[in-house]
Amino acid sequence: MWWILGAFGTAALVLVLASVFLFRFALARRPLTEIPEGGEREYLKRHPKGQAQVEWWAGVREARRWTERQHTEEWETRSFDGLLLHALLISPAHPGNRVALCVHGYRSCGHGDFGQIQRFYLEQGLRVLLVDDRAHGKSQGNYLGFGWLDRLDCKAWCQELADRLGPDCSIVLHGVSMGAATVLAAAGEPLPSQVKGVIGDCGYTSAWDQFGHILKRDFHLPVFPLLYTASLVCRICAGYWFQEDAPVKQLEKSDLPLLIIHGEADDYVPTAMSRRLLAASRDPGKRLVLVPGAAHAQSYAVAPERYQQAVMEFFRRIGMA
């Protein structure tokens, strides 16, 4: 009898420890480790499969250098739970009243996910607000919101833009990966009337679906029981359940104009999730653009002209062209 109880106790302890590890591994704040310019060869010696990271950091540095030549302003706002959030406003030479609020993805940054897109937006005369997600960059926070807490941060940035730029400004929300989940979830919240539409690039349907997919793909593990207990740890430490973190449910409350873009070769966030997101939206003119051959968050890099065309058609529909 006692050995049975001991076995159950040991199994429970292992499950708790594994759940805490999973939560901290996935959602605890960690700084980005930059590959310094000139250090690529040494990095590849240690990480033979790291060419994608090398190219990503090269793109970040190029975007930074470009941004330094533009007119920029550092912005801050306060989150609903008291965190100081940071963003960078980039303006064209002759700024108008249109602005793209750009939300980066998981453990990324604005220059990483919008390095090329921000140039396109400025060429079209838009201002660009690159936000640092909570627990990223210069924003405060110990744990990632994984799109759920961030949806309210996005709402706060929308209000900040509306307050500073006035009633005549027009705002489009644009997110990549976790940033897409953020703006899609924000679409289900009451937003300022200045918000005209939402662009989601390779977003997931819910945290539960996404973590479940990664558990199966990378670790060959079922969602039960680990994801249930990890969700409980997240609720205790970060304040939300994986199950409630569901952009797909938020879209059921939204009739904001919607454009979804997704790479057909994405095996990190399955393309099927975008189809479910599209189906959930109440926007009668909603559109899904699939990019053949594009892996996760690579649609713009693979097909920039098609991406730009889809965005401009969307802008014409919402009166922001």
PLM regions: where:
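N-terminal cap/lid segment of alpha/beta-hydrolase-fold proteins
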Residues: Q51-P95
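The serine-hydrolase catalytic nucleophile loop
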Residues: Y106-F120, D133
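Conserved alpha/beta-hydrolase "acid-adjacent" motif
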Residues: D267-M273
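Conserved alpha/beta-hydrolase
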Residues: Y121-Q140
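Alpha/beta-hydrolase active-site loop
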Residues: L144-L165
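N-terminal membrane-anchoring alpha-helices
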Residues: M1-W56
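Hydrolase active-site cap/lid region
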Residues: A185-W241, K249
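Short beta-strand/loop motif that positions the catalytic acidic residue
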Residues: K253-D255, I260-H262, D266
